[in-house]
Amino acid sequence: MQKMPIELKGSNFTFLVLYLNTNNVDLISKSLYKKIQEYPQFFKNVPVIVNVSNLLNQVNWKKIQEIIIEYGFYIVGVSGCKDNYFKKIIVESGLPVLLESNTTNTNKDLRSFYHTSTLKKTKNEQRLRVKKIEKTHIINTPVRSGQKIYAKYSDLVVINNVSAGAELVADGNIHVYGSVRGRVLAGANGDITSKIFCTTLFAELISVSGQYWLSDQIPSHFIGKSAQIYLKNKFLTINSLS
């Protein structure tokens, strides 16, 4: 049967939400700059929804929009706008005003933010990924800032420390027997059964199959402790190893 030239279908995309809590353009700019300096590659061209529910009157939306774009964010829509005049300004700037129910289900506290990528995989796809996992890739030396290690179709084991600015990526599980201060991304090929294990957690970012937490989203009582990170009911979950 021949397919139609175009199709409109429902999907399950979710986005990072940028909550603006001040009208002060300079303060917004400085705060974005500081955040980007912490994770320069992570925020490059990342799509975001801008939530303006906490903004008061006299908002210079044009300038705020310019600043967000200048820092490399891609605005896909604006949520939390209740003022009709403000809505008109946003629409005239070329952006859609989104209903709250259409945005990511997040707590206003960024620490509670769950980034849920599309996780609908067929059983056959999952079996193929499991079959592709090969011999474990083992690193015995320290992983320095700026280094990136990718264990393709494999688990990754690091028996040493991982510095801030370093990145570990594996299609399977990742084990770090040491202190980890860089970025750790398991299940890079979409395997939702992958896990992260580490003995001393100070990571800048942890991710399993596309779902991630930044350092300030990791529950504080796990910082500096041994932990395992995995997906449970499609959400990132962390437990103690001790």
Curated annotation (Swiss-Prot):
UniProt xrefs under Pfam families: MinC_C, MinC_N
Function summary: Cell division inhibitor that blocks the formation of polar Z ring septums. Rapidly oscillates between the poles of the cell to destabilize FtsZ filaments that have formed before they mature into polar Z rings. Prevents FtsZ polymerization.
Oligomeric form and interacting partners: Interacts with MinD and FtsZ.
Protein name: Probable septum site-determining protein MinC
Gene: minC
Ribonucleoprotein listed as a keyword: no
Organism of provenance: Buchnera aphidicola subsp. Schizaphis graminum (strain Sg)
One Gene Ontology term from the biological process aspect of the record: regulation of cell division
Family: Belongs to the MinC family.
